[in-house]
């Protein structure tokens, strides 16, 4: 059984990690241990590089905290080009897989508040009345009328980031 350290305690992210690992390695093939670690970037990262750095930092910090795991996984959400997206970073101590998620364009009224220094989650909670929306369906769930959720979009990115770990051509 793979010991997987999730560098987040966010249920939407943990669900995506668990589903993706079970899709690739089989049901019951992993045990997820969530840990809270620092990203080293602002609460609301801007730009692809800052967001990717946050995910990389979370993986590195999780490795230091739990060095005996088989995999360390981080998902960092950010804002870039008026849209929300995330970077997924997965490491197994030998190699690393990284993937960027799909992007969701955000309305100007939301972006204005985020650019003024508020994080997307609290802004979305204000507009929707859904407490801790970032730990649930997220802006993605709201603006796609539930056709996609934060977790479903993360799931795809985790699957992509896992590619180097089960395809020999990457080695």
From Swiss-Prot:
It catalyses: XTP + H2O = XDP + phosphate + H(+); ITP + H2O = IDP + phosphate + H(+). Gene3D superfamilies: 3.90.950.10. InterPro entries: ITPase-like_fam, Non_canon_purine_NTPase, NTPase/PRRC1, YjjX_NTPase. It comes from the Bacteria. Keywords: Hydrolase, Magnesium, Manganese, Metal-binding, Nucleotide metabolism, Nucleotide-binding. The keyword Translocase does not apply. Its EC number is 3.6.1.73. Its cofactor is Mg(2+); Mn(2+). Mg(2+) binds at residues 38, 68. Binds 1 divalent metal cation per subunit; can use either Mg(2+) or Mn(2+). GO terms for molecular function: ITPase activity; metal ion binding; nucleotide binding; ribonucleoside triphosphate phosphatase activity. Substrate binds at residues 8-13. GO terms for biological process: nucleotide metabolic process; thiamine metabolic process. PANTHER family: NON-CANONICAL PURINE NTP PHOSPHATASE_PRRC1 DOMAIN-CONTAINING PROTEIN, PTHR34699. Belongs to the YjjX NTPase family. Phosphatase that hydrolyzes non-canonical purine nucleotides such as XTP and ITP to their respective diphosphate derivatives. Probably excludes non-canonical purines from DNA/RNA precursor pool, thus preventing their incorporation into DNA/RNA and avoiding chromosomal lesions. Homodimer. This is Inosine/xanthosine triphosphatase. The gene is yjjX.
């Amino acid at each position: 059984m793979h010991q997987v350290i999730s560098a987040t305690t966010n249920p939407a992210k943990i669900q995506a990690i668990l589903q993706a690992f079970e899709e690739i390695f089989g049901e019951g093939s992993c045990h997820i241990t969530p840990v809270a670690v620092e990203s080293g970037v602002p609460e609301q990262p801007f730009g692809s590089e800052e967001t990717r750095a946050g995910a990389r930092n979370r993986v590195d910090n999780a490795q230091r905290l739990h060095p005996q795991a088989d995999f360390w996984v981080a998902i960092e959400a950010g804002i870039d080009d008026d849209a929300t997206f995330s970077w997924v970073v997965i490491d197994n101590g030998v190699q690393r897989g990284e993937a960027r998620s799909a992007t969701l364009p955000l309305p100007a009224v939301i972006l204005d508040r985020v650019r003024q220094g508020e994080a997307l989650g609290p802004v979305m909670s204000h507009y929707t009345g859904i407490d801790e929306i970032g730990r649930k369906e997220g802006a993605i769930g709201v603006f796609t009328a539930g056709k996609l959720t934060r977790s479903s979009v993360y799931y795809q990115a985790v699957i992509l980031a896992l590619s180097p770990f089960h395809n020999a051509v990457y080695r």
